[in-house]
């Protein structure tokens, strides 16, 4: 089926309407010169009728209709990883990140966008969607909650992570939990004892740093606290690399992967 542009193009190349070949035929009494001049005339008409898209890339761009923005842009978008898929090895493998980020997180984004349509939370911030849908819309909450958790999870890790904790954050942890060693011990224990899928957390509640845990896609947001560090203990997060050794995974995370600068950034936001 031809488009209007194609039809115009065909007419211009054929010559006068309803007489496709007539303009190309010289009459018996025409001179060669007149035949040549008529040929030039037909060629000029044909060239004038060819649409702009047959020309340069600039002509194409000038004649292409502008892309219209979505009337309601998607609220959830899969972020790029802030490092290469193999950058966290040997503590988290390339294969784990390919499955975890590229497949599992993408599924939360896709499902979340579909479930968000037509709800009262459409167009609201991710944090508002998570808090608002909790206890009211389980399907939306599960996917929005996991999207929120993973948006930060990728930033809570970095190559050559772990190491020294920034001073202000270190003091807040010591004031809230007792010591850095105790915080790490309780954090690992929270993850190990989380039955089934879930997360373990450092969070700020009432101005104090606490260690806590949550099931499935829940987070401290739904209990009135603000998360500043979280570790995913769903099996897809560690089973390729650690099999059933969840404690080893949690120890590797807290000692070798944590991006304490980002944790500090979230802490500063939480106490404002």
Predicted regions and their residues:
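An amphipathic alpha-helical core segment
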Residues: 189-245, 250-261
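Alpha-helical scaffold segments that form or flank carboxylate-/histidine-based iron centers
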Residues: 90-104, 126-148, 216-219, 223-231
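C-terminal segment of N-terminal export signals and the immediately downstream linker at the start
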Residues: 51-88
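N-terminal export signals
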Residues: 18-21, 28-29, 35-56
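All-alpha RGS (Regulator of G-protein Signaling) helical domain and cognate RGS-like helical scaffolds
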Residues: 103, 114-123, 132-205, 210-211
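Early transmembrane hairpin module of multi-pass membrane proteins
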Residues: 87, 93-122
